[in-house]
């Protein structure tokens, strides 16, 4: 069973957590070419392309200009610090947790494509609609689709053919998602709040649950999809009367 989790815009600058090993991103070369190109942009262009403030644009210009400083590298699972990662709590993982995650978790990234948790990466900011000379003018969604679709399918098939989809739907566009769903069994847990007359998905809760469920799978060494039904978080519980086999619902009353 493989897990797919989205990267986050917010990133850490350092970590003191020990990890059992370090690995290299599969698409380090492509990421380096992108970083080299972005390091030549001015802050105004970065603001426009990354849809961010001047301060964030300046911070990321500096990041891209120091992209080859190995002292700034972090394991991907500890580099991100968005809402999902606050609930993943990887800084509390044991060495065995990290080892299990390395074999079972993929993290999507606009800059690096697809990462394993212990791949060493540099902090960055990127958007999927950015077009670069290095991509021959394609946006990153289109560029990565050619690389990542087969990679993900082959990795899932090499395991047990099951993918737990805990990434945001935006990142599906990095793949030929229709083909992924045809070739492997994709299970996408969904998280809702019961509003009485309807159920509603609230982004912050969904992100929290995705991170917490990833942690739950890793720390409990889960290898059967039905075992995720035991997941609970702050009132979110499996609701068997909702959804279906491929879209299990977890609802907070």
Model-derived regions: residue spans:
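Internal, well-folded beta-alpha domain core
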Residues: 90-244, 249-253
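Active-site helix-to-loop segments that bind/position phosphate- or nucleotide-bearing substrates
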Residues: 2-92
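C-terminal accessory regions
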Residues: 1-2, 179
């Amino acid at each position: 069973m493989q897990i797919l989790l989205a990267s986050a815009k917010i990133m850490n600058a350092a970590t003191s957590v020990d990890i059992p090993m370090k690995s290299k991103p599969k698409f380090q070369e492509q990421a380096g070419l992108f970083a080299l190109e972005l390091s030549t942009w001015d802050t105004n262009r970065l603001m426009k392309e990354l849809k961010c403030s001047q301060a964030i644009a300046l911070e990321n210009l500096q990041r891209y200009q120091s992209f080859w400083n190995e002292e700034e590298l972090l394991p991907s699972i500890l580099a991100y610090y968005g809402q999902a990662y606050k609930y993943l709590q990887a800084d509390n993982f044991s060495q065995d947790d990290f080892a299990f995650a390395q074999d079972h978790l993929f993290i999507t990234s606009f800059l690096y494509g697809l990462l394993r948790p212990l791949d060493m990466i540099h902090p960055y900011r990127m958007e999927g609609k950015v077009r670069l000379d290095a991509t021959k003018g394609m946006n990153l969604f289109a560029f990565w689709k050619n690389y990542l679709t087969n990679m993900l399918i082959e990795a899932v098939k090499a395991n047990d053919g099951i993918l737990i989809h805990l990434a945001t739907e935006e990142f599906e566009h990095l793949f030929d998602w229709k083909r992924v769903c045809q070739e492997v069994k994709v299970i996408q847990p969904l998280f809702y709040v019961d509003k009485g007359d309807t159920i509603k998905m609230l982004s912050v809760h969904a992100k929290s649950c995705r991170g917490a469920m990833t942690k739950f799978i890793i720390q409990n060494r889960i290898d059967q999809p039905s075992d995720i039904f035991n997941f609970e978080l702050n009132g979110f519980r499996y609701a068997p009367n909702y959804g279906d086999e491929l879209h299990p619902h977890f609802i907070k009353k």
